[in-house]
Each structure stands twice: as structure tokens, then as C-alpha cells.
Amino acid sequence: MELRPRLGATCLLGFSFLLLVTSSHGPNGLGKGFGDHIHWRTLEDGKKEAAASGLPLMVIIHKSWCGACKALKPKFAESTEISELSHNFVMVNLEDEEEPKDEDFSPDGGYIPRILFLDPSGKVRPEIINENGNPSYKYFYISAEQVVQGMKEAQERLTGDAFREKHLEDEL
């Protein structure tokens, strides 16, 4: 008879844990530890939105098993500055098998995590790098401060009049 209450409590505890784990991915499940308060898109949806809105894309490529990726997640998610700057980008979060096979998404190698910036047309802009990082791994960011600096550089280069003028020159 004592087994029944324990079994019920164990089932309730298991269900609660399952609910906690599944709800930690947020309403759209795209945060993956990088912040459910950020409006994440898939790459396909992000490219469409960027083309329609004129906003650049910020793409994070990471793996669920990667130690450096796991270390970056809380720093990224807890940064109010990243959260604020994210409103000026279409944010894309690619994990594991979601990583694109296109070589443009690994301009200097397939290491992880990588953060790339794309212009509103969906073209990877390899000139936007982590200026304060390892020169052998130009798209590897280890701190929120480095990410913020990259976002500010991308915003400066890929939005506003400067980008439009440069983009028009390229088309002519």
C-alpha cells in the first residue's frame, strides 16, 4: 500500500520535470539557451523577413554538445545590451543539424560557435568579424562584450544611408 503514494509522487515529479524542460525553450523553441526573450527566426523565415524589412541578419551557429557554446549562452541571454540591439536585426539561431551546408556560412572554418552577419539580401558579410578575438577564428565570440561590438559594427555597416549608398554603387 505504501508503494502507491510513492508511485504517484514519482509520476508527478517526472511530469513536472518534463514540463519544466519542454517549457524552457520558450513559445517558439528557438532560443536554445541564447535567450527566449529574443525573437528568433529560422534561417528561411529570417531571410524572408530581412528582405521585406531591410534589416540585417545575425546568425548564431552552434552545437548542443559544444562546451564553448554552452559557456556563451548565459552571457548572451543575460546581456541587456544584446537584447536591445537584437531589435535592429533579424535574429537566427541554428543548432546542430540546422547548420547550413553552404560554404558561405563557414568563411574561415567550421568551428563553433560562429556568429555571422548577413545583409538584408541574405548575403553573408565576411568582413564583419570579432575584432577583439583570435585572428584564426574571426567569427568566434566568447563574451557578451565581443558580441555587442560585432552587432554595433554590423549595424553601422549594414543599415542606414551608408549601406544603401554602397549597395546602390555595387548594383550600378
UniProtKB/Swiss-Prot annotation:
Keyword Signal in annotation:
yes
Annotated GO biological process: negative regulation of endoplasmic reticulum stress-induced intrinsic apoptotic signaling pathway
Q: What intrachain disulfides are recorded? A: C66-C69
Q: What EC identifiers does the entry list? A: 1.8.4.2
Give the stretches traversing the membrane: none
* First-level EC class: oxidoreductase
Signal peptide position in this chain?
1-26
Q: Where in the cell is it found?
A: Endoplasmic reticulum lumen
Catalyses which reaction(s):
[protein]-disulfide + 2 glutathione = [protein]-dithiol + glutathione disulfide
Q: Which domain of life is it from?
A: Eukaryota
Q: What does this protein do?
A: Protein-disulfide reductase of the endoplasmic reticulum that promotes disulfide bond formation in client proteins through its thiol-disulfide oxidase activity.
Name assigned to this protein: Thioredoxin domain-containing protein 12
From what organism does this protein derive? Bos taurus
Taxonomic lineage of this organism? Eukaryota, Metazoa, Chordata, Craniata, Vertebrata
* Gene designation: TXNDC12
